[in-house]
């Protein structure tokens, strides 16, 4: 009846701000330089007030955004999160996840996985997220370039260095977090190769991303059934397990604790 009372609830997520790269592009595209400078100053005041004391706080703004986004993207990748619509309007200055969707977490592992029906060419596919974030950051750099240095060549040189460092740092962060999922140190080349071999096996066997990594801990408890169930190439996987165990012996860590501690809830912002 119309007079009946039903309990309902609303989940609201509040961001530190809704400033995005697209906000900067809006003013830059109209050559509204004074307004763009005011926006940059507000972003600094809102998110990074300490950099106002630096000699080149617009360059530092770019560096801070790069650092925050690098951490965010690496965490996305490590838990199999696909944002879905990574255009500049959804790329925050604060380094938070907003306006995601159609978003999802990976089921069967594949770098080209998309969940958005409008993303026909896979621009925002899981494996493309680091490069798309770099593209978005370059767009922000283009908006700030006139404020970074009056000498355009010098400004471009400084911005390019930030972008190059971003790509290197992000790729290493992804390796570190992904290697952590298998109990290994991501800075070691051999461990990186072991990770890549596992991901190749997962792709070829259409293995579930989360279940595969989670079931690795069972192997250390002498139960490999859950892990092996994710693969039909049993011989290749058995060889990988042997290589992985050899690498683990060199790490000398409490690997079971590492496996059970990280979770998507704790590691995405």
Task: Go through the PLM ranges and name each one.
Residues 88:
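Catalytic-loop Lys-Pro-X-Asn motif of eukaryotic-like protein kinases
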Residues 2-9, 259-264:
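Conserved small/polar residues in nucleotide/adenosyl-binding loops
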Residues 120-261, 265:
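Regulatory N- and C-terminal appendages and interdomain linkers associated
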Residues 268-269:
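Ala/Thr-enriched low-complexity intrinsically disordered regions
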């Amino acid at each position: 009846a119309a007079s009946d009372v039903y309990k309902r609830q609303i989940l609201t997520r509040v961001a530190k701000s809704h400033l995005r790269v697209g906000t900067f592009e809006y003013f830059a595209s109209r050559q509204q330089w004074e307004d763009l400078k005011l926006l940059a100053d507000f972003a600094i005041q809102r998110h990074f007030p300490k950099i106002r004391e630096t000699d080149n706080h617009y360059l530092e703004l770019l560096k801070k955004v790069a650092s925050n986004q690098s951490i965010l993207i690496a965490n996305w990748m490590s838990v199999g999160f696909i944002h879905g619509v990574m255009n500049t309007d959804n790329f925050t200055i604060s380094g938070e996840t907003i306006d995601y969707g159609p978003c999802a977490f990976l089921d069967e592992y594949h770098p080209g996985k998309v969940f958005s029906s409008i993303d026909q060419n896979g621009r925002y596919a899981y494996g493309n997220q680091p490069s798309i974030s770099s593209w978005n950051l370059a767009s922000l750099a283009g908006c700030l370039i006139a404020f970074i240095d009056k000498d355009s060549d010098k400004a471009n040189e400084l911005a390019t260095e930030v972008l190059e460092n971003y790509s290197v740092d992000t790729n290493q962060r992804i390796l570190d977090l992904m290697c952590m999922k298998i109990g290994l140190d991501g800075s070691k080349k051999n461990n990186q190769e072991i990770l890549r071999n596992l991901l190749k096996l997962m792709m070829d066997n259409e293995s579930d991303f989360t279940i595969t990594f989670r079931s690795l801990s069972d192997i250390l408890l002498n139960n490999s059934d859950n892990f092996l169930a994710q693969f039909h190439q049993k011989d290749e996987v058995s060889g990988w397990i042997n290589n992985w165990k050899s690498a683990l012996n060199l790490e000398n860590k409490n690997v079971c604790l590492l496996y059970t501690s990280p979770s998507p809830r704790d590691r995405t912002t």
